[in-house]
């Protein structure tokens, strides 16, 4: 779609497989994250924008998943805990961790985004006591206060997703997760959306969750939440499409480009999963971005 060299860390999302749980890969070419802070705007403007986008892309893409999220109480997930507590709150803090900088000047101001759709076993979760749930998450349920280190399990969700560099720097990402669900169908989940200047940060979080550090010390929340999708995208700066780009695009591979090492350990590979609809995903083609199901048979 765009004939410039790809962003330094843009590649197919590599599945991460542990002994019991797998972060699956379900590649796609385009992600539209449409959000509003008011319900009436979600129902009106967000729907209309989505409708117009798909009309403009008619025949060029095949939608493989659509999720309608919502705000649940005081920004809680359907497990009952506040979600995104550690996400940066100010624009300045968010920009510092989410936006690409001088390390990749052609894409400065853009951001990588990893998305995963998790389905929850709420029946099993709700059979636990609040104290058991708090040990799994690593926070008090009502107050959202993090448990003291002495009381926090090493395989709690908070412990698994805390990334500390060797120099003591805590690595953050911008989370914009959405709870979703349909009571009639009995489907309840969390749509994880993580923005970062370096996808290796999220990949290391996922490695700690699904494989464990040390190996086997996996995130207990995965006993109740199953990842059914997983994909890595790049969100370009607003003026991206207006820029001239005479250079042919580079092919997408699963490997990190030379000169841009990731901060994550090498993930354990697992088979590429099918789309949530049960239909197999399109074969990767060399004439597209190479990471999904974009239909290039139509010319624009």
Question: Model segments located where?
Answer:
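Long, histidine/aromatic-enriched segments associated with O2/redox biology
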Residues: 1-272, 276-292, 296
């Amino acid at each position: 779609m765009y004939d410039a060299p790809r962003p330094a860390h843009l590649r197919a999302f590599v599945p991460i497989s542990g002994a019991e749980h797998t972060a699956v890969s379900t590649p796609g070419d385009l992600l539209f994250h449409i959000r509003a802070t008011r319900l009436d705007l979600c129902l009106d403007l967000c729907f209309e924008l989505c409708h117009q986008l798909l009309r403009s892309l008619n025949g060029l893409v095949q939608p493989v998943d659509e999720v309608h999220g919502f705000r649940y109480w005081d920004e809680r997930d359907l497990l009952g805990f506040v979600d995104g507590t550690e996400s940066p709150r100010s624009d300045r803090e968010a920009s510092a961790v989410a936006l690409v900088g001088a390390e990749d000047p052609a894409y400065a101001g853009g951001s990588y985004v990893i998305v995963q759709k998790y389905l929850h076993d709420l029946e099993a979760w709700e059979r636990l006591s609040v104290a058991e749930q708090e040990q799994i998450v690593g926070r008090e349920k009502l107050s959202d206060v993090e448990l003291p280190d002495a009381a926090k399990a090493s395989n709690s969700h908070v412990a698994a997703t805390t990334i500390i560099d060797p120099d003591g720097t805590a690595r953050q990402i911008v989370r914009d997760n959405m709870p979703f669900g349909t009571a009639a169908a009995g489907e309840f989940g969390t749509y994880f959306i993580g923005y970062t200047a370096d996808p290796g940060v999220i990949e290391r979080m996922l490695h700690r969750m699904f494989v464990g550090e040390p190996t086997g010390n996996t995130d207990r929340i995965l006993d109740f939440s199953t990842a059914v999708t997983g994909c890595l995208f790049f969100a370009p700066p607003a003026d991206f499409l207006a820029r001239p780009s005479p250079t042919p695009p580079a092919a997408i591979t699963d490997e990190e480009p030379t000169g841009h090492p990731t901060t994550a350990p090498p993930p354990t590979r697992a088979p590429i999963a099918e789309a949530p609809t049960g239909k197999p995903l399109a074969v990767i083609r060399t004439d597209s971005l190479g990471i999904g199901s974009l239909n290039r048979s139509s010319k624009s």
